[in-house]
């Protein structure tokens, strides 16, 4: 109806991201052995159908742009380059409007701001921070961001907009606000923020300013993908003691949750010479997206500690030598089919670790060469049926709604791939329908 395009070409294997000519895949645990016992696997992950060269980003526009254009065709007034700064409340406590700062539409300032902010977004997202030359692209991005902020500082006008039927806060989360992350989720402060420049927590602050309450502010989703290359997932992931704690083939958000929430943010992939050789070969598979190849090679070359024996590796990294030896022997036995794996890992996804030298790759929250992408889950508490923001007594604040990452939502306890679009569409429609029903 709105011209957002999807495609049925499917990628059936485990992967952090499908090849660029596949648009339906498994962004979850459905292919993991222990999960397959509970439910038949189904590829539920849809990428928007758009040809984007070799880039794995920028696909959201294929969904957003048609929805935006449809809304504009229906009469929506869109205020570009406008920031909400304050809510207006009447004597009964109802939210009736918002104070905004706007760069005048069509002005020279607006033209320059649009150009600068687009360039800032391009360069800031160009390379993961650990990759060579990332400091250069990030520096260029910050240069353009400062130019855009300078225009904001002198070129904006104050306006008040009346909200006759309701006001919806949907400004994203707060992962790009270091102070908020440090306050609410300090264990993830060294992760790599995964969001847009707008994820500053502004909507949460606005809601709190009129009595809105928050929840789950310390809940963070962390994404630790180690496949590709499959050789890493075929090896073992251990904690600071040298113990396994998970099936290594689980979805990246599941592995990241285990590491960040249950292992003190510290974990390593331990693999042997055979796995290292296989990983180099797999990194050059033409089916990989460039960022998968580059990150794999970077970590194979720079992110490892190496030793001739398991015991020497344990001493070098700081594992308990006896624990690491027992972990590897138990894993090798399960990989050979001599005993079941305690984490129900599929034997087809296991390779014995027998050929020295042995390697340990840091996949912790603070890993230097393998940054851990993180997003925020917490936000304003809302009434489930309507999306109205709740106050300290658990009562709805009249006229004030919240949606998306600004609010606590269906997926605020655990990551579900695609939650940003899916939850925004669902929670936005819920608020709109409640407003429409109230005015019938």
Named regions from a protein language model:
Residues 72, 172, 208-211, 436, ...:
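Hydrophobic/aromatic-lined pockets within catalytic cores
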Residues 161-173:
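Short hydrophobic core segments
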Residues 179-204, 407-439:
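A conserved FAD-binding loop/helix module that cradles the flavin
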Residues 1-157, 165, 179-181, 196-200, ...:
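Mobile, glycine/GP-rich and aromatic-enriched active-site lid/loop segments adjacent to catalytic centers
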Residues 176:
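Glycine-/small-residue-rich beta-strand-loop submotif within the FAD-binding core of flavoenzymes
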């Amino acid at each position: 109806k709105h011209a957002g395009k999807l495609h049925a070409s499917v990628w059936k294997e485990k992967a952090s991201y499908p090849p660029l000519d596949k648009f339906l895949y498994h962004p979850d645990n459905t292919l993991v052995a222990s999960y397959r016992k509970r439910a038949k696997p189904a590829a539920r992950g849809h990428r928007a159908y758009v040809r984007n060269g070799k880039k794995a980003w920028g696909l959201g526009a294929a969904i957003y742009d048609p929805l935006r254009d449809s809304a504009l065709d229906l009469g929506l007034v869109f205020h570009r380059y406008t920031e909400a700064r304050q809510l207006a409340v009447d004597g009964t406590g109802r939210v009736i409007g918002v104070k905004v700062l706007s760069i005048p539409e069509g002005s020279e300032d607006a033209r320059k701001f649009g150009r600068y902010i687009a360039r800032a977004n391009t360069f800031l997202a160009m390379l993961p921070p650990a990759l060579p030359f990332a400091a250069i692209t990030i520096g260029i991005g910050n240069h353009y961001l400062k130019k855009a902020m300078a225009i904001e500082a002198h070129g904006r006008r104050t306006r008040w907009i009346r909200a006759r039927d309701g006001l919806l806060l949907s400004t994203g989360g707060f992962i790009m606000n270091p102070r908020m992350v440090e306050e609410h989720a300090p264990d993830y402060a060294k992760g790599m923020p995964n969001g847009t420049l707008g994820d500053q927590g502004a909507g949460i602050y606005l809601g709190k300013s009129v009595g809105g309450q928050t929840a789950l502010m310390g809940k963070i989703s962390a994404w630790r993908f180690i496949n590709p290359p499959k050789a890493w997932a075929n090896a073992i992931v251990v904690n600071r003691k040298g113990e396994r704690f998970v099936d290594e083939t689980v979805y990246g958000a599941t592995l990241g949750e285990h590491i960040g929430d249950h292992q003190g943010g510290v974990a390593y992939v331990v693999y042997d010479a055979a796995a290292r050789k296989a990983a180099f070969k797999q990194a050059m598979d033409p089916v990989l997206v460039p960022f998968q190849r580059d990150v794999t090679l970077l970590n194979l070359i720079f992110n490892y500690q190496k030793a001739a024996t398991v015991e020497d590796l344990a001493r070098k990294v700081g594992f308990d030598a006896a624990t690491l030896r027992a972990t590897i022997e138990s894993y090798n036995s399960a990989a050979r089919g001599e005993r079941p794996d305690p984490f129900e890992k599929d034997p087809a996804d296991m390779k014995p670790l027998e050929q020295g030298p042995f390697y340990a790759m840091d996949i912790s929250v603070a890993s230097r060469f393998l940054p851990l992408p993180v997003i925020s889950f917490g936000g304003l508490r809302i009434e489930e049926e309507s999306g109205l923001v709740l106050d300290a007594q658990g009562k709805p604040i009249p006229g004030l709604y919240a949606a998306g990452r600004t609010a606590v939502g269906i997926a605020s306890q655990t990551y579900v791939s695609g939650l940003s679009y899916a939850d925004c569409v669902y929670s936005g429609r819920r608020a709109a329908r409640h407003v429409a029903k109230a005015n019938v």
